[in-house]
């Protein structure tokens, strides 16, 4: 989930999102017992600065820390002051391997580069992930993006995405899904791509008035039409949308 809002981000949204931990679509085409209960995380930028970052192993639907953090975020910008903005990212994890269920592997991941704080979350996996107990494939993808970013603007992220995609194919044999959201606090970048199971690796994007919401499955009153594969969408803090074909 990713939200760019000029007002508050309602608590109802966090509740509905948490329900996807048990009710969300799974790779076989329907919810299953495993669900997306191997980790959760929330990151919130207020006016470009990282305000909250909380994550843990386990299911968001059962986590008091998840709801507590969501409540704190929901109280921000209630006054709708002009020029203020919120960018919120949320992730529910379904681990590719049960041995990799741990807090440190919960998304979104946050890293500072050249004075800029980036948050990143991903759905999918690399075909041949290196045996490295310190990083999962999503973290490797994050590093590839950051290593090839030449700026913060839409065009720079599109270029880095193209390079990271090519490296994923060349060095790791490709990917199942390359769906990700990336933010520097000023914009939210949303990308959908897959080489298998496109009915599972979906991403939806909708303008709900004072906020634009992106999610793997429609929540609240989002339209049920996924964004096209291979098209990077960038939402600025003033809700301007840019698109660029990457693949």
Roles of regions detected by a PLM:
Residues 1-66, 190, 195-198, 230-247:
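Extreme N-terminus nucleophile/cap motif
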Residues 3, 88-91:
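A short, Trp-centered hydrophobic/proline-enriched beta-strand micro-motif
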Residues 25-31, 87, 154-194:
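Catalytic core of PPM/PP2C metal-dependent serine/threonine phosphatase domains
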Residues 42, 89, 141, 180, ...:
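A residue-level signal for conserved active-site and pocket-lining positions in enzyme catalytic cores
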Residues 57-77, 91-114:
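Short acidic (Asp/Glu) patches
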Residues 118-128:
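Conserved beta-strand-loop-short alpha-helix elements that form
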Residues 132-170:
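Glycine- and acidic-residue-rich phosphate-binding/metal-coordinating active-site segment common to enzymes
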Residues 196-231:
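A conserved acidic, glycine/proline-rich C-terminal tail/linker
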């Amino acid at each position: 989930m990713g939200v760019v809002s000029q007002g508050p981000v309602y608590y109802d949204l966090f509740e509905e999102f948490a329900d996807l931990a048990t009710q969300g679509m799974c790779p076989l085409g329907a919810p299953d017992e495993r669900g997306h209960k191997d980790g959760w995380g929330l990151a919130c930028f207020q006016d470009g600065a990282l305000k909250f970052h909380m994550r843990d192993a386990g299911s968001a639907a059962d986590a008091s820390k998840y709801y507590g953090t969501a409540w704190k975020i929901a109280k921000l910008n209630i006054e709708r002051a002009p020029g203020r903005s919120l960018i919120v990212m949320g992730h529910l994890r379904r681990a590719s391997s049960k041995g990799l269920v741990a807090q440190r592997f919960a998304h979104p991941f946050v890293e500072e580069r050249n004075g800029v704080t980036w948050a990143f979350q991903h759905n999918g996996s690399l075909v041949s992930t290196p045996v490295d107990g310190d990083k999962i494939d999503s973290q490797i993808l994050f590093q590839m993006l950051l290593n090839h970013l030449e700026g913060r603007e839409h065009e720079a992220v599109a270029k880095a995405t193209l390079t990271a995609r090519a490296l994923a194919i060349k060095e790791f044999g490709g990917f199942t899904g390359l769906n990700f959201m990336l933010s520097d606090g000023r914009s939210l970048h949303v990308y959908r791509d897959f080489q298998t199971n496109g009915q599972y690796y979906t991403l939806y994007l909708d303008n709900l008035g004072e906020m634009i919401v992106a999610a793997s499955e429609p929540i609240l009153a989002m339209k049920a039409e996924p964004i096209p594969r291979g098209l990077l969408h960038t939402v600025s803090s003033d809700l301007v949308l840019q698109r660029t074909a990457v693949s």
